[in-house]
Amino acid sequence: MQTSTFTITSKSFQDGGVLPKKHSNFGEDVNPELEWTNPPQGTKSFALINDDPDCPIGTWTHWLVKDIPANTTKIEENSVPGVEVVNSWGVANYKGPRPPSGTHRYYFMLYALKVEKMKAKNMKDFYKEVEEQKLGKAVIMGKFSKP
């Protein structure tokens, strides 16, 4: 039985804190560093969803990464550890925060999965498959406002 909690942290920002401008669409538009510990036993891969639930037209997905190897414990800044899937921007890469107004929350949700490779080829299938295949989930959230 696993007693440790599956946790995700970042050297780029604190959970609930402000995302640096460099990680936004107003800055360098590079992904933040993310690191995790204690994935569930039986984890065969990871998948990452980065989204903004405060978007006026509904949740906006900024980054989708699948097939992150099970032995991975970190995503370096400005790097891709797996296969990217097309996001709400219509591109298969990280696109940082660009809120039209106000302060938005940006969630980085890391899923530990029971499969090595995901079948999902689009955003809708990606969300569905992570729910079906997840063993655990770790979340960190950063906030950002239009500069």
Locate each region found by the language model.
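N-terminus-centered regions that define maturation/targeting leaders and the start
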Residues: 1-147
